[in-house]
Amino acid sequence: MRSEKEGAGGLRAAVAARGPSGREKLSALEVQFHRDSQQQEAETPPTSSSGCGGGAGKPREEKRTALSKVVIRRLPPGLTKEQLEEQLRPLPAHDYFEFFAADLSLYPHLYSRAYINFRNPDDILLFRDRFDGYIFLDSKGLEYPAVVEFAPFQKIAKKKLRKKDAKTGSIEDDPEYKKFLETYCVEEEKTSANPETLLGEMEAKTRELIARRTTPLLEYIKNRKLEKQRIREEKREERRRRELEKKRLREEEKRRRREEERCKKKETDKQKKIAEKEVRIKLLKKPEKGEEPTTEKPKERGEEIDTGGGKQESCAPGAVVKARPMEGSLEEPQETSHSGSDKEHRDVERSQEQESEAQRYHVDDGRRHRAHHEPERLSRRSEDEQRWGKGPGQDRGKKGSQDSGAPGEAMERLGRAQRCDDSPAPRKERLANKDRPALQLYDPGARFRARECGGNRRICKAEGSGTGPEKREEAE
């Protein structure tokens, strides 16, 4: 086997021999190979004759392997490995031969290639001289001139010798394989019987596999979602708890208010019941015999009462004023009024308290009932009252000439009494501030006593005119 320098020299000689003919130019790889070989020759110093100190003065030589792998390019795309071996025969000694068909994705540059690793470097030159530029023909008769050059990658794949496996070709005798075949056949029968069941089983298996398959990133995302969900649940619970607390406070406030209102209502009802009991107790007390309860409220405190001698007497509020007969002397009523005033005041005050509440409930209803069912009787009574009022009024007018202004006031009171009798429902007259009583500002039974003023005055007129008990019964 020749050295690398000899091989390079032979290659250069061959190239020089072929150069003048103009058959083919050198490839770029060959030119690089020549340059590398020249640089190697220039760098190697000449060996010295003396052996002393030769090892220390020599530079370290780089080990370079000889190029032995060759590639044949631009072969026809339809060429096969067998056809290429037939055309390359006789092929020098080699330990590596690999053929690669054309790649259709590189159209229109569709070429096949082959790699050969020669054992003897001298055979490389002979092979190159023989097949570099050799024209290969395909099935269609197209010519493809080949190109022979050193392979860029000189290493070759080593074929490792493997021991033959003892179990090769014995799978049919394996008991596990036989068991698998049995279960597989049974599953095929079930599948043919019910495909929906198989589909459900496949989906379940797929879901199970997906559930089992996990990564740290998926675990982190899952934990993050669970944490966020937990925080949301806590916030929701806190908000619900606050709302329940507010609702509870509102309910307590409402319940407390209802309790207060209930207590107030009970208190007011209790007071009303006590007042009603007191009124009933007062009503149960009967007035003394011979006394006629009156509820007439005087319109003026200290109202002047007409007396027989032309004098005026102040009457206390709530006192009953009875008209004296105008036909008799005026001195006799004056004496009787002085003697019975004290007793009358006491009796009137006691009777007012007892009958004020009873009259308040029954007077208005009785008057409405009588006015509704007896309009003829009311009209006839009003005519009689007007006729009766003329006689006493004229007598009073005659006697009033002798008195000093007293008959004028009596006439006015008589006219008011007649108006009250004529009207179906008596109306309360408003009092001026100057006419209101100074001491007794509030009188509980004043309104109802004012409504009864008509009946009492009719009694007074009956007594003054001397008509007797008949007219008094009609007035009642």
Swiss-Prot record:
One GO cellular component, as annotated: exon-exon junction complex
Expression sites by tissue: Isoform 1 is strongly expressed in testis, uterus, muscle, fetal brain and spinal cord. Isoform 2 is strongly expressed in fetal brain and spinal cord.
Stretches the record annotates as Disordered: 1-63, 250-476
Source species, domain of life: Eukaryota
Region: Required for interaction with UPF2, residue numbers: 66-140
TM spans (from-to): none
Keyword Ligase assigned: no
Function text: Involved in nonsense-mediated decay (NMD) of mRNAs containing premature stop codons by associating with the nuclear exon junction complex (EJC) and serving as link between the EJC core and NMD machinery. Recruits UPF2 at the cytoplasmic side of the nuclear envelope and the subsequent formation of an UPF1-UPF2-UPF3 surveillance complex (including UPF1 bound to release factors at the stalled ribosome) is believed to activate NMD. However, UPF3A is shown to be only marginally active in NMD as compared to UPF3B. Binds spliced mRNA upstream of exon-exon junctions.
Subunit relationships: Found in a post-splicing messenger ribonucleoprotein (mRNP) complex. Associates with the exon junction complex (EJC). Interacts with UPF2 and RBM8A. Interacts with DHX34; the interaction is RNA-independent.
Protein name: Regulator of nonsense transcripts 3A
Species of origin: Homo sapiens (Human)
Gene name for this UniProt entry: UPF3A
